[in-house]
Amino acid sequence: MSNLYVQMQNGWTAKNIESLRPYFTDALFTQMERSLQGYAQRGETNVVERIAVLDVTPLGFHQTGGEDQILPRLRTRITDYTVNDGTQQIVRGSRDQEKFMTYEWDLLRPTGMQTNAESGETKRITCPGCGAPLDVNASARCPYCGTVIQQQAQDWVISAIRGIKQQTL
């Protein structure tokens, strides 16, 4: 989860989270993409730097409605600011002030699925639109033809990220 958090923040700054699609539900991925599109429409970039995951604590495991659910809490440290793409001037936040964030994530997978360490986190399939090979967990966008492929999640996906606490130093 620590690695995924860092990848997510780096993708956010790069305004490209497509490589993270297999790790999110379609609803959460779409919500995050819309947020990034809002920054792009305003001509802004939300920059996240000095990323560190300080702690990951499992809070619980549940089975409901045919799904397994894991609830971890992540404590992180970042710097977070927004720049105008044209002028590179900071419009919100600070390059210097560190934010200590606490999040709770919801991770889901179908009950009965088992994580196979040898096969990794995704499944290799063929794009129905153009025949290209794709690695998919819950969904993926073909980089060749743009087709979005959805299937039942084969492994854990993040369905929600809740900000619990924020402290700026």
Where are these regions (language model features)?
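Core segments of small alpha/beta cavity-forming domains
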Residues: 1-51, 129, 143-148
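Amphipathic, alpha-helical segments enriched in basic
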Residues: 7, 47, 82, 117-120
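Short, well-ordered helical secondary-structure segments
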Residues: 11, 45, 59, 92-94, ...
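Short beta-strand edge/turn micro-motifs at domain boundaries
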Residues: 69-71, 85-169
